[in-house]
């Protein structure tokens, strides 16, 4: 996955947009940054917030995060966004998976913090630690394969930094460890049902 290739390169900063608002803010922040910054944009979010149903893709019209000021603004590199607030489980996602995770949280009925990472390198470990101290549980969601990915490093860091706060192991919902199959794309991608199942599993551990 491109995110793994770039995040494993020392010296690069990597940001990942999930909405029109943070896409503009992160891009301007990247332009103004003195360091090299890779800006990743999920094509799945070009038309609207993708909630995991390929037959029902809404547009950005009337979505609060689609209101993009014409004036200059930036989204700080290295700072996460709290997309949903809860108290039972922390769900961490980035890019298009933020919206799929939102749908999954609604489906699960579990009160969850949803952290939109926004910045992969550096990532906002303080926001993650604060959330896990509150919830005691964590689910990571990304569309890249599971093995040897950026999410693996993040899960390891969370286990190290939040060990005494965690009441269950960090759970991950990812793409499969296969070449990306365009003809069966929707079977490959993490779905709301898979994420909701992982949230329930984490709550039971």
Spans of features found by a protein language model:
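Thiamine diphosphate
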Residues: 43-44, 48-205
